């Protein structure tokens, strides 16, 4: 199973600056909180497609690639016309599942970065 956050991507996007990474993770958390409220399969597909688009960019910027991919699939579905409620529900569920995993990994990574003040030794798996 792929990791929820690609640490190499996060490190590259922040030029190895642990403080910047912590800031980026916080911004992601705030963005995800705002956009995730609009992920409602009962709503207009354009609304949840926009939300998925917003989460997608933020996710990929911190290395949450599986979340970005789930968002891309939901966004594409929402922009294709009128998906069924089942299709919408499945796509949005996938986004929410990946978002939950990313937020859990984010908390773990953020804690380690704050404690270590560097990327050295930061891991996603409990050790």
Report residues per predicted region:
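Intrinsically disordered or compositionally simple regulatory linkers and C-terminal tails
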Residues: 1, 111-127
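Proline-centered turn/helix-capping motifs that create local helix->coil transitions or kinks
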Residues: 1-2, 67
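Long, amphipathic alpha-helical coiled-coil segments characteristic
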Residues: 3-54, 86-110, 127
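Feature targets compositionally biased, intrinsically disordered low-complexity regions
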Residues: 15, 77-80, 120
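Short, well-ordered alpha-helical segments
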Residues: 47-51, 59-80
């Amino acid at each position: 199973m792929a990791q929820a956050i690609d640490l190499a991507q996060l490190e590259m996007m922040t030029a190895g600056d642990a403080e910047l990474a912590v800031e980026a993770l916080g911004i992601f958390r705030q963005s995800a909180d705002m956009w995730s409220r609009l992920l409602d399969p009962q709503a207009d597909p354009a609304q949840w497609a926009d939300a998925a688009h917003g989460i997608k960019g933020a996710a990929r910027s911190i290395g949450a690639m599986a979340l970005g991919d789930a968002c891309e699939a939901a966004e594409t579905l929402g922009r294709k016309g009128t998906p069924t409620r089942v299709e919408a529900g499945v796509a949005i569920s996938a986004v929410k599942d990946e978002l939950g995993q990313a937020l859990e990994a984010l908390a773990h990574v953020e804690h380690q970065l704050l404690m270590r003040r560097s990327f050295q030794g930061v891991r996603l798996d409990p050790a």
